[in-house]
Amino acid sequence: RIDQAGRPHHLLYHLARAGWTDIMLIDRSELTSGSTWHAAGGFHTLNGDPNVAKLQEYTINLYKEIEEVSGQATGIHLPGGVMLVSNGDRLDWLKMAHARNRYLGVATEMISVAEAKKVFPVLDEKQFVGAMWHPLEGHLDPSGTTHAYAKAARMNGAEIVRKNRVTGMRQRPDGTWDVETEQGAVHAEHVVNAGGLWAREVGRIVGLELPILAMAHQYLITEEIPEVVAFNKETGREMVGVLDFKG
């Protein structure tokens, strides 16, 4: 496995748990030193692909297991989340997404804007026409979660090699691979390109041109909002996350 970011550690853990103990993850630097260290850490299950939505729900439910297995905190918080829409077309889309989620066993619920305001009291009801609620939404510590996966994978027999850049790969006639690294060659039956942001460059080592492009996302960090602080203090719980779909 040639690694970058948190997802490869997720896969490494599952392979090790399934009995693949002779596996190695090769990281060119330190764990979480790529895009993970500055990730916002938010998560939700709403996705245009229903299979991805179901996979996201599975992963969210897995975080507590990873904490228990590894003893490493993930910093997970599950206040729940509300998806809001501001027009009829988007409301139709949200209803479709809800129906698809329920078919797959994802426990979303259509709620009124008034009900949404009860869990997100700073909401301006006049701006929206509908909402969907899901309890498995929130945020976590990306770095802590990655290290929890890594520790759990090691406990199941996996090996992680850090500060070891891959410099080349060559396939043998029998289909196995020689992976050249800065610390020497590794002979592998299978190679997983988990390079994330650099997966295209890793693919080019063996002549593959992967259609991967980095997308610039953004998040906003604010000062404390008095209304949010007051809500959290008065209710003893965290105000939910909100997504606004304007089309």
Predicted regions and their residues:
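Gly/Ala-rich phosphate-binding loop of Rossmann-like dinucleotide-binding domains
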Residues: 12, 16-17, 152
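Beta1/beta-strand and adjacent pyrophosphate-binding region of the FAD-binding site
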Residues: 1-8, 24
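Flavin-dependent oxidoreductases
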Residues: 169-247
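Glycine-rich FAD pyrophosphate-binding loop
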Residues: 16-37
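Dinucleotide-binding Rossmann-like beta1-alpha1 core, especially the glycine-rich loop
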Residues: 41-119, 239, 245-247
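Residue-level detector of alpha-helix initiation sites
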Residues: 5-7, 30, 197
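Flavin (FAD/FMN) cofactor-binding and adjacent substrate-gating region
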Residues: 65, 86-162, 167-175, 180
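Residues forming the Rossmann-fold NAD(P)(H) cofactor-binding site
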Residues: 9-10, 200
